[in-house]
Each structure stands twice: as C-alpha cells, then as structure tokens.
Amino acid sequence: IVLVNDGSTDENSLNIAKEYTLKDKRITLFDKKNGGLSSARNVGIEYFSGEYKLKNKTQTIKENSLIEFNIEGNNPYEIYTVYKSYKAFNNEKDLGNFTYPNIDYIIFLDSDDYWELNCIEECVPRMEGVDIVWFDSIGKIEIDKYNDWYSPLKNYFYKKAQIITPYTWLNDSIKLNIKGFYFVWLGMIDFKYLKSIKLKFINSIMHQDHHFGMLLFVQAKYIYIYPKSLHIYRLRDNSTINMHNIKKQDIPPYIYNIFVSFNENMYLTREYFSVFSMHIILIECVKFLNKYNNEVLNSLFKKAFFELLIVKIFRIFNFNKDPKNIKKNMKYIYRYK
C-alpha cells in the first residue's frame, strides 16, 4: 500500500497518514511537494517500478516509531521523506536493504473515495488473462449540481460480466455516441502491462484520467467487464472537478499564473485550465497515435473521442485572455476538425 501526501496545506492530513502508516506495516508513506494528482499517482507507479533509490535517515529502530528514508539521486517530484512503520523491520540491517516490493496488479484510490471491503478479493481472480478489470462505482455526491453523476461503465449498458477487446470498446463507444472516456480508480490494472506500455499520468493538468484511460484501454489485449459497484466516488467542495470553491492558499502552483491572469477569479481560472488540459490531452493523443502501429484502432479512436476534445478546446475563444497561448498553437487541430 502506498499513501502519498501531495503537499497538503492541512498538516493534520499528514499526521493522520503517519498514524495509519505506524499501525500497518504494509503502508509506505510518501510526503512530497504539491504537484497535483498526476504527480502523486506517478510516484506510486515509479516506486513500484523501482525507479527510486531509498536511503535510510533513521539509524535505529524504536518501538512505536516511524522509520524515515530519503530519496537518493533521481527525485523529480521533490519527495521530502518516505515513512515506514518500525513493524516492517526486524533489525537495523533491514533498514539498509529496504526496497520496493514486486507487485502483480495496481489499483488507484483517491483520498475522498473508498472501496467496498471485498473489492480487491473480487478483482484479483478476474485478472487472469486480462490487462484490466473494469468495475462499477456509486456516486456519493455532496454538491447539488453534480447529483446526476454516474460512472462511465453505466454508459455502455454492460449488464453481465464479460471479456472484451479494445475494438469492442471503441465500436461500442461510437455506436452509443459516448464521446468522452476516463479511467483511473474504476478498476485494477496488470502492473506488467502498465510498465510495458510506459504509460503515466500527464503532470500539471486536470482531466488527466481521460488521457490515461483512453491510452490504457486502446493498448490492452483484453478487458474484463465486471458490472458490480466496488467503489464509492465522493464529490466534495474542494474536489478537482469543483475547484470553484478552493481557497487561495490551496491553489496548485502550476495553476497560479492563470489565477493571477484572470484577476484571481477562481471560476475563470478553472474553466480556462480545463480548456488548456484538453489541449494538452489532444496533443499527447495525436503523438501516441502517430507512433501506434494499428490503423484500425487509430481510426476508431479518433472517430470515438476527438470530436469532444476539439469542441472543448474551442471554448478558448470564449476567453479574452490566453496566458498559455493556446490559440497560437491550434494549427494541428484543423486537420481533425
């Protein structure tokens, strides 16, 4: 289990994470600079991939204490400290030998959300021979205007457990007029598969689960559809999708210049940042498809999802300011319009 404290301005959040880490030796806690959801998730991927070298800062093991580690060398996300419970080590020699565990599968969970108690047990046996298990989610919405949220799986009307291919997924998307897709906490992923396609989350944007989900599914061999609700999605005031009510001190650093450009209007900042994020996502999808050697899937992918991405990007013309120079970099869009 990996917990990531992404530079929370609420110190109590880190303290709570430390309490859980102390109690459960399975947990590894990363405390890092605020970099957003993508960077937090990428820390987990990179840790389990063996991309970090850990050096113990704590020299002696004391009961009821946390063992602290530093990252040596490559530390792109500015991880301050890595914490582990004393229970995970038998002696001081173990501290110097601590490294990442080998995992078969990875599953993501945001701090607001939670799983049904049997989620992992339900997923693992269904991972046999597939790259992804895609399950359903129930919304627990605390904001009135998002009360109509429902999970992407429901859009596809899959009523029974089945195994599909990317061809089926894309053809169903087109047939059912599903123009947008996202995936991150809605299932379990084979970790060898994830590493083999070298897919990570785009840093410093929102809607990163759209890019991640689309590229994850289109490259899969088989996807297990499990239309059972194993996840509870909570939407609260400071969720990324509802940045309108975020406090000034909680604004991520990669958004701050936009916030200033729009005279500290959080609504305009959020709307512009959404356009910018879709712009980056489309660019990265185009780059991927230009290298992906499957003409049929490439064509289906564009037909299914490019229209909505382009429509959302064209909202840029609703703004009289353009701090990220989106309008100057839109020539690539017109070939797909």
Regions found by a protein language model. Give the residues of each.
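Nucleotide-sugar donor-binding/catalytic module of glycosyltransferases
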Residues: 1-257
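C-terminal subregions of glycosyltransferases and related glycan-biosynthesis enzymes
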Residues: 234-337
